[in-house]
Amino acid sequence: MTPTRKINPLMKLINHSFIDLPTPSNISTWWNFGSLLGACLILQITTGLFLAMHYSPDASTAFSSIAHITRDVNYGWIIRYLHANGASMLFICLFLHVGRGLYYGSFLYLETWNIGIILLLTTMATAFMGYVLPWGQMSFWGATVITNLLSAIPYIGTDLVQWVWGGYSVDSPTLTRFFTLHFILPFIITALTTLHLLFLHETGSNNPLGITSHSDKITFHPYYTTKDILGLFLFLLALMVLTLFSPDLLGDPDNYTLANPLITPPHIKPEWYFLFAYTILRSVPNKLGGVLALLLSILILAVIPILHTSKQQSMMFRPLSQLLYWLLATDLLILTWIGGQPVSYPFITIGQVASVLYFTTILILMPIISLIENKMLEWA
C-alpha cells in the first residue's frame, strides 16, 4: 500500500522537499546552515510576534514599552533577548551559508544564488529596521545616519530622505513605518525562502567535490534530518548560553539611553553584522562613492558566477584559490573590527586598505589565480 505522504497533495509536497528528497551522500556539516537559517526565521517570527503584542511604535512610548516588556511582561526579558541574539545567530549562519556557497561553487546554480542575494539584502534591511525600534540613542542616530545616505542620490535624494522620514527629521512617523516594514518583511523573506528551495530542488544540492552526484544519492530522511537536528541542538545551546549569560554582549550600551536628537553619541555604529559594509562606506571620502561602495560590497556576489574562470566547480582541490578565499575571510573580519573603531588614524588607513583588498580579491585576484590553476592542471 502506498504511504499517505506519497498520495496526499499537501503531504506529497512536503515529502518531495524534506523526506524522500534525493540528496548527495557526501555533503558535509557546512550544508547544515540552510536548515539552521529556517530555524532562525521561525524563532524570529515567533518571538517578534509576541514582542509586537506589547510594543508601542511611537517616539514618546517606544523606549518605555521595551522597558515594560523586559520588566513587567511574563518572560518578556527572554523573548526580547532571544529575538535580539537570534538575529545575531541568524547572521552568523547566513554568512557561513554564503561562505560555503563561495567555497564549493554553489553560485553556479544561478537562480538559487540570485534569490539568495535578494534574501540577504532583505534580511539586512529587516535587521536594520529592527535595530531602530527600541528608540535608544544608537537606534535614533543609526537611523539618522543610514537613511541620510539616500540624500547622496542625485536630484531626488533630499525628497527621498524626507519621504522615508515622514518629515524633516527622524521622528514618530519614521518609527511607525519602520515597525510596519519590520513586521511584514519576515513574511516576504519566508516567501523568498520557499522560492530559494524550489529552485534548489530543481537542480539538486551541490556537494563538496563539485561533481555530479546523480549516481550516488540518498533520501533526506532519516540521514540528513538526524544530522540537521544535531546542528540545531548545538545552535540552540550557543543561543541559550549567549541569551542567558551575556544577553547584551553583542549590543551597544548607548541603546539603554533614551533617544535624544540634541546629543550625538561619541561613536555612531550599526549592529556588528553590518560593520564590514559600514567600514567600506566610511573608507570612501566621497558620500555618493561611499554609498555605491556599500551597495557593491553585497551586490558583488551577483558577478561572482561571471568571474568564475576555473575548470573545477569546488575549491576542494585548488590550494591557491583556498589561500585567497581565507585571505578574503580574514579581510572581512578586519573590516568588521575596523567598523567598531572610531574614525581616526590608524583605523582609517587599515579600513581603506582592507576595503581595496576586498574588491581586488574578488574581482581580480580570484579569476587570475583560477586561470593559473587551469594551466597547472594542463602541465600536470
Swiss-Prot record:
GO molecular function: metal ion binding; ubiquinol-cytochrome-c reductase activity
Cofactor note: Binds 2 heme b groups non-covalently.
Stored PROSITE patterns: CYTB_CTER, CYTB_NTER
Transmembrane segments: 33-53, 77-98, 113-133, 178-198, 226-246, 288-308, 320-340, 347-367
Topology within the bilayer: Multi-pass membrane protein
Family matches, as Pfam families: Cytochrom_B_C, Cytochrome_B
Binding residues annotated for heme b b562, in chain numbering: H83, H182
GO BP terms: mitochondrial electron transport, ubiquinol to cytochrome c
Protein residues bound to heme b b566: H97, H196
Gene Ontology cellular-component terms listed: mitochondrial inner membrane; respiratory chain complex III
Keyword terms of this UniProt record: Electron transport, Heme, Iron, Membrane, Metal-binding, Mitochondrion, Mitochondrion inner membrane, Respiratory chain, Transmembrane, Transmembrane helix, Transport, Ubiquinone
PANTHER family tied to this protein: CYTOCHROME B
Anything else known: Heme 1 (or BL or b562) is low-potential and absorbs at about 562 nm, and heme 2 (or BH or b566) is high-potential and absorbs at about 566 nm.
Official protein name in the record: Cytochrome b
